[in-house]
């Protein structure tokens, strides 16, 4: 498997259920994840509980909801060897909607309500449109926006600065399938970030 770090101990649990007999729905999916990861010093570095529910309607539209809770943990990486700090417990909520992907024009909308490491709100929203005139060509235009009240940056020697930030990220992708084995893809993306110093930490 893939490890995000070389001093990691994991004990995770995943549950996934697909129901195809739910009244008024084509499909209902439920997933439950428990993430429990520690470093070799015995400190919790990644903890989380996730409950996800997806509803696929008879007209093939999809509604998603995700609830998340991150218990208190230790961040031992952002400081790059200058020290660890404690991250308080945080909550999160995701809402999503997608229209029928088989239509020539399909739309998607997502809302993400979360918290930064220091506790203040982090809000994200995205929308997309997909144009698929035939089975060989498709284009996808997506726009993401993120508003953060406490973007934490390590400035060196154990000094940190939190920023109020706003980020826009448009993305355009076009695909053309020459045949069953060959595909051409063109992707253009751009990210704009504006940040203002807010508080200083040591």
Where would I find each of the regions flagged by the language model?
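Exposed, low-structure sequence patches enriched in small/polar residues
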Residues: 1-202
């Amino acid at each position: 498997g893939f490890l995000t770090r070389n001093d990691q101990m994991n004990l995770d649990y995943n549950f996934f259920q697909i129901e195809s007999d739910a009244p008024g729905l084509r499909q209902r999916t439920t997933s439950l994840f428990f993430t429990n990861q520690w470093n070799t010093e015995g400190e919790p570095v990644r903890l989380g509980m996730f409950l996800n529910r997806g509803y696929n309607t008879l007209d093939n539209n999809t509604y998603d909801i995700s609830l998340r809770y991150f218990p208190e943990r230790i961040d031992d990486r952002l400081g790059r060897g200058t020290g660890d700090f404690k991250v308080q417990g945080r909550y999160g909520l995701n809402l999503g909607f997608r229209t029928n992907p088989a239509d020539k024009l399909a739309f998607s909308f997502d809302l993400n309500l979360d918290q930064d490491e220091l506790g203040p709100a982090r809000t994200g929203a995205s929308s997309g449109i997909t144009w698929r005139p035939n089975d060989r060509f498709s284009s996808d235009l997506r726009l993401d926006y993120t508003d953060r009240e406490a973007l934490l940056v390590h400035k060196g020697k154990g000094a940190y600065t939190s920023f109020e930030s706003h980020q826009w990220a448009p993305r355009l992708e076009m695909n053309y399938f020459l045949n069953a084995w060959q595909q051409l893809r063109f992707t253009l993306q751009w990210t704009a970030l504006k940040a203002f110093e807010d508080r200083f930490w040591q």
